C-alpha cells in the first residue's frame, strides 16, 4: 500500500510541475500578444498621423521627429527608433516613381529572448506580418 501511495504522490508532483510549465508558457504568450496589440495600434496611429501630415504638406510624409514637432505625435516618438511596449519602431520616408511613401516597421526589441511577430505598414495602411524576420510589403496581411 505504501508503494502505491508513493507512486501516486510522485505522479501528482509530476503533473503539478507540468501544469506550471504550461501555465507559464501561456502567460508568456499572453504578454507577447498584448505587446503585439500595442505595437499594431501604435503603427495605425502613426499611419494616421502621416496621412494627416500629408494633407497639409503637399502629399509628403516625414520623420518621427518632424511629426512630433508638428504636434502629430507625442514626445514618446521623438527619436529615430522609438521603443513602445518592447517593440522598436523604425520608419523610412521618401519619394520614388510612384510618389511619396513611408514604410513603418515594428520589431520585437529582444529577438532571441522574447516571442513576438514583426509588423509593417505603409501608406496603403495594410498591416503586414512576419513571424521570424522584419516584415515588408511582400509579407501577408495580418489577420485579426
Segments from the language model and where they lie:
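Amphipathic alpha-helical segments typified by the pilin-like N-terminal helix
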Residues: 18-52
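Positively charged n-region of N-terminal signal peptides that target proteins for export
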Residues: 1-4
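Extracellular/periplasmic head regions of type IV pilus-like filament subunits
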Residues: 28-29, 48-115, 121-127, 131, ...
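Bacterial N-terminal signal peptides
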Residues: 7-17
Amino acid at each position: 500500500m505504501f508503494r502505491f501511495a508513493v507512486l501516486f504522490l510522485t505522479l501528482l508532483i509530476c503533473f503539478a510541475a507540468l501544469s506550471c510549465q504550461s501555465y507559464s508558457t501561456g502567460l508568456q504568450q499572453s504578454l507577447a500578444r498584448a505587446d503585439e496589440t500595442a505595437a499594431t495600434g501604435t503603427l495605425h496611429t502613426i499611419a494616421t498621423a502621416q496621412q494627416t501630415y500629408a494633407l497639409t504638406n503637399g502629399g509628403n510624409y516625414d520623420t518621427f521627429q518632424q511629426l512630433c514637432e508638428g504636434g502629430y505625435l507625442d514626445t514618446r516618438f521623438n527619436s529615430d527608433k522609438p521603443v513602445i511596449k518592447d517593440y522598436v519602431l523604425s520608419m523610412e520616408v521618401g519619394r520614388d516613381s510612384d510618389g511619396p511613401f513611408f514604410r513603418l516597421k515594428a520589431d520585437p526589441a529582444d529577438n532571441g529572448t522574447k516571442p513576438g511577430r514583426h509588423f509593417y505598414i505603409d501608406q496603403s495602411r495594410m498591416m503586414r506580418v512576419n513571424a521570424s524576420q522584419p516584415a515588408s510589403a511582400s509579407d501577408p496581411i495580418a489577420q485579426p
